[in-house]
């Protein structure tokens, strides 16, 4: 099985978690990172492309199997819409958008395009939630 080529948008706290997971998974390959901070480029392994904005990514010539959006919440809708327009599966970190209307528009677009659209709910796997569940059961 070939590895999935992932583009990561945003290299803040959550983006760094996604980056670590992508790089440690034998089934995924981090092909590029989009972040406006040039300092973040220094954190990338050799061979991982750096883009300072989404418009710099050559989607026509890059092999991108999926995109993870971990940028600022206010940018999620615009980025998600562009990625879905390209028929590329996308995971958008929570909160997906600043309002439910934009989320519904993204959901509708994903259905029309028959493309995967998911919310990143990684924190539900945080061990603290298991601990809280145990407390509630006592």
Spell out what each predicted region is:
Residues 7-9, 91, 118:
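Conserved hydrophobic packing residues within short motifs/helices of P-loop NTPase cores
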Residues 22-23, 57, 136:
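Hydrophobic C-terminal alpha-helix "anchor/cap" residues
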Residues 97-138:
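A contiguous active-site-proximal alpha/beta segment in oxidoreductase catalytic domains
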């Amino acid at each position: 099985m070939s590895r999935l080529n992932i583009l990561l948008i945003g290299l803040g706290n959550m983006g760094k978690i996604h980056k670590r997971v992508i790089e440690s998974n034998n089934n995924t390959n981090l092909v590029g990172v989009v972040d406006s901070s040039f300092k973040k480029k220094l954190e990338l392994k050799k061979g991982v492309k750096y883009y300072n904005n989404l418009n710099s990514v050559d989607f026509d010539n890059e092999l991108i199997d999926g995109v993870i959006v971990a940028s600022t919440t206010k940018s999620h809708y615009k980025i998600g819409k562009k990625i879905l327009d390209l028929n590329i599966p996308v995971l958008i970190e929570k909160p997906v958008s600043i309002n439910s209307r934009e989320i519904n528009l993204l959901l509708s677009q994903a259905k029309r395009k028959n493309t995967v659209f998911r919310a990143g709910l990684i924190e539900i796997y945080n061990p603290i939630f298991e601990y809280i569940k145990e407390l509630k059961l006592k």
